[in-house]
A protein has these predicted regions:
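Alpha-helical transmembrane segments of multi-pass membrane transport proteins
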Residues: 1-435
Length: 435
């Protein structure tokens, strides 16, 4: 059978399994098994399956994944969202948009220790939505800023999505982590800039400022954020200075999260075991997907489909910018049907050869992928952040999707910025790992 025929058979099989509700990991394993039947030389599919699943699961780099997930689960069950709102609100009261900026900053802070977009969105929305509604803030901007800012959970390290990409693309997790810091700040500035512009254009829809507080009172309100800020600085410096590997940083992050939960009085045996079980469920799901993706990628490599596809795309002589534009459209389309991790594991084996041929750095491409995954998080019908806010606000899905639309286009702008100015992404990895 020709490579085109093999590709069609595998795509139809995978699509059928996913449409039938089969678990993504199982669908990938089944498609990989089918792909091995087309491999030349009679390579035993069972032996390759055992080798790839074990090799993928026993990776030292992947040991960071359950730890980062657990760290986010621990903090998700603390009073952190309440303390962040109270601690940040007094400092932002005089900026146009006022407390709407708390959504952006709080999501940025929590995202830097949670690694999950949905957890970040849910944690901040839990306290922010009632407070903003009570003060009379516009529902659409409140929902949109939470949907958009919630995506910072996977852009500002540590990030579960970044770990998955780094393992799939065989690049340094630490370098991908470091590459995400400045783009994360750029996205936060874009979000806050939009809120300022909207507020200035709609002053009648912005509530009056809260009564002013003295500097001493502001410090007292922000005091409980100090342990969290110290944890963020410690993780960042450990990565930048090379004091610890990503897995070691994750372990220290778990200990720091437990300490913060104890500090807030939220660490009980029930909450501890709930966080353990929550992290275990998420990790098992992701590990099964990664095992299936690894097996399917190997089977596709044996058939020669990715290399042939990369060669075919190369015949179009696309410029680097045109290739990135085409990939952006492809990922946005995939994001309407798949979650971010599934998008990464399904496309990495095919896309990486094209990216290498175009001369892009794989660390830079990792941040590009994270940004387009963020777009998927706020794209109907399967955007996780939209589901979270729909549940927490009681609004219908169309309303939440419309509210998030301006922030979707801000993410498109962020992709354009890092494409034109790639040093925004690469400066920290180059500082930490000079050539």
């Amino acid at each position: 059978m020709s490579l085109v025929g093999i590709s069609l058979v595998l795509v139809v099989l995978l699509t059928t399994l996913l449409a039938g509700g089969v678990w993504i990991g199982v669908a990938l394993l089944a498609t990989g098994w089918a792909g091995m039947q087309f491999a030349p030389g009679g390579i035993p599919a069972g032996s390759v399956l055992a080798t790839k699943v074990w090799g993928n699961s026993a990776s030292w780099e992947l040991a960071a994944l359950p730890l980062f997930i657990w760290m986010g689960e621990i903090l998700y069950r603390t009073k952190l969202s309440e303390e962040m709102f109270r601690g940040l609100a007094p400092w932002l009261n005089r900026i146009p948009g006022r407390l709407l900026h708390v959504n952006v900053l709080a999501c940025g802070i929590f995202g830097s220790v949670s690694g999950s977009s949905a957890a970040t969105c849910a944690t901040v929305a839990k306290i922010a939505l009632p407070e903003l509604k009570k003060r009379g803030y516009d529902d659409m901007v409140s929902l949109g800023s939470l949907a958009g800012a919630g995506t910072l959970g996977i852009l500002i390290p540590p990030s579960i999505t970044m770990v998955v990409y780094a393992v799939q693309a065989n690049v340094s997790i630490i370098q991908v982590f470091l590459a995400g810091f400045l783009p994360g700040l750029v996205v936060m500035v874009l979000y806050s800039g939009y809120i300022v512009a909207w507020s200035l254009a709609n002053p009648q829809r912005t509530p009056p400022a809260d009564p002013p507080m003295s500097f001493r009172e502001k410090l007292r309100e922000s005091g409980k954020l100090i342990p969290l800020m110290l944890l963020i600085v410690l993780v960042f410096l450990s990565l930048l200075m090379g004091w610890a590997t990503a897995t070691e940083c994750a372990a220290w992050g778990v200990l720091g999260s437990l300490a913060i939960a104890w500090w807030h009085g939220s660490l009980t045996w029930p909450s501890f075991w709930t966080s353990v079980m929550g992290a275990m469920r998420v990790n098992c799901m992701i590990m099964l997907i990664l095992a299936g993706a690894s097996y399917m990628s190997t089977s596709m490599a044996y058939t020669g489909v990715p290399q042939a596809l990369a060669t075919w795309v190369g015949h179009f002589n696309l410029s680097p910018y045109a290739l990135i534009a085409a990939l952006t459209v492809m990922y946005v389309a995939l994001g309407t049907a798949l979650d971010g991790i599934s998008m990464i594991v399904l496309t990495t084996a095919v896309v990486i050869p094209m990216i290498k041929a175009a001369g892009f750095d794989l660390v830079w491409f990792g941040i590009f992928v994270v940004l387009v995954v963020e777009m998927a998080e706020v794209s109907p019908p399967v955007g996780f952040n939209l589901f979270v806010l729909q549940t927490m606000s009681g609004k219908d899905s169309n309303t939440v999707a419309r509210a998030s639309l301006p922030f979707f286009f801000l993410l498109v702008l962020a992709v354009a910025i890092i494409t034109v100015f790639p040093d925004i992404v690469m400066v920290l990895p180059r500082m930490a790992f000079p050539a």
